[in-house]
Amino acid sequence: MVEYWKRNFFMVLVLQAFYLANCLTDEEIPEEWLLLHVLQGQIGAGNYSYLRLNHEGTIILQVQSLKGDADIYVSSLTLNPTFDDYELQSTTCGLDKITIAHHLSRPVGIGIYGHPSHMESEFELKVYYDRTVREDPFADASYDPEVLEAKQRQQQQQTSLDSSQEEESVLRTILIGVLKIVLELLF
């Protein structure tokens, strides 16, 4: 019986070791992401550390809490975002990740907050640039004079064809109406 419990206890320890090893390994970074900057820092409980992002394009921020719990808040409206005033946030324990879209106005304020559950938090911030080219959803709606002119000509031809058919229809209706009146008068 003791051997049974020893074996089970050993299995639990092995499983915990595998789980811990998986948690500590870095997440795979796509090839399209270019590492721009790495910053390590410390933040006291309930305090903020502020950064400013001027780089254009799609930016990915990864904050890894090395000790304690550091959360991240982002805003294009204020350079000092807080947990009350932000546009993007990530407040998980461990790895926090935020994607700042390319259309968000720059500069962007970044606030790293030391959660009060720990007296001091250590963090590592990695800033990535996403090089993937995304199609502009409004590209088809943009102004191209040649395409616009061709569409206008096509619409004019269509409206002239429609108007000639409409004129024929009106003439037929009038002619049929006159014939009905004449036939009523005669009979």
Swiss-Prot record:
Assigned GO CC terms: extracellular region
Entry's localization field: Secreted
Residues modified by glycosylation: 47
Keywords, comma-separated and alphabetical: Glycoprotein, Secreted, Signal
Signal peptide extent: 1-23
Pfam families from the UniProt entry: UPF0669
Family assignment from sequence similarity: Belongs to the UPF0669 family.
Protein name according to UniProt: UPF0669 protein C6orf120 homolog
